[in-house]
């Protein structure tokens, strides 16, 4: 649902990972969840890569696609207003895409988001470190970040933006391919071709013992028997 909403907002395809390990769910049940993670970034990488704060959606609204769309739309509008207010601090700054890279789903986990698997993983790694710092800081005091003017200057620092804007975006960014018989020579050759085009690949086969390790590390491998209806 959220991947489709992102596509509707941007006309691009996105890679989204649902993080629901015990520690990922635990922090989303905090009573101070909505106040703890809206205070700004911990380091420059946080604001540059995943915005200064995540989008947090209350549990009671998670089952409504309309509500989800409204929350994302509100986040976008808030970000655009932030850019409009502070753009005077960086001459000739151009707005980055305003979509959240982290969405916290109260009570069930969080989503890490990117235009490809690598970007999605960067979103996860940065937020995972960020939340640990904020939670630990609050054990001894209260976490406080820099003000919005300085956040904007950091986020739109021209040299950093130039580096991000010059990233090559391949035609098939954000697409996902599922290959049956993926551990065989033909399946792995197809997978390798897709990987080179920035397509995220899921391989299905009975086992992956003989699969090239370089292919295996770049794909999601699911062991299954497609002839077995019980699977």
For the regions a language model picked out, list residue spans one by one:
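N-terminal Rossmann-fold NAD(P) dinucleotide-binding loop
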Residues: 187-188
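The beta1-alpha1 cofactor-binding region of Rossmann-like NAD(H)/NADP(H)-dependent oxidoreductases
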Residues: 224-231
């Amino acid at each position: 649902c959220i991947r489709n909403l992102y596509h509707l907002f941007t006309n691009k395809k996105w890679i989204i990972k649902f993080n629901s390990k015990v520690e990922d769910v635990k922090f989303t049940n905090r009573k101070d969840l909505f106040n703890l993670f809206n205070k700004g970034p911990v380091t420059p990488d946080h604001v540059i890569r995943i915005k200064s704060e995540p989008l947090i959606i209350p549990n009671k609204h998670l089952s409504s696609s309309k509500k989800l769309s409204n929350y994302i739309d509100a986040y976008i509008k808030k970000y655009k207003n932030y850019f409009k207010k502070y753009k005077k601090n960086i001459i000739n700054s151009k707005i980055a895409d305003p979509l959240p890279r982290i969405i916290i789903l109260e009570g069930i986990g969080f989503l890490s988001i990117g235009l490809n698997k690598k970007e999605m993983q960067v979103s996860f790694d940065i937020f995972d470190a960020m939340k640990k710092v904020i939670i630990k800081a609050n054990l001894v005091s209260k976490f406080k970040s820099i003000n919005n003017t300085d956040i904007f200057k950091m986020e739109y620092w021209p040299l950093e933006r130039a580096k991000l804007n010059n990233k090559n975006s391949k035609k098939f960014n954000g697409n996902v391919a599922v290959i049956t018989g993926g551990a065989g020579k033909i399946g792995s050759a197809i997978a390798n071709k897709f990987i080179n085009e920035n397509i995220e690949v899921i391989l299905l086969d009975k086992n992956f013992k003989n699969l090239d390790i370089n292919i295996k590390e770049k794909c999601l491998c699911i062991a299954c028997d497609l002839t077995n209806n019980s699977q």
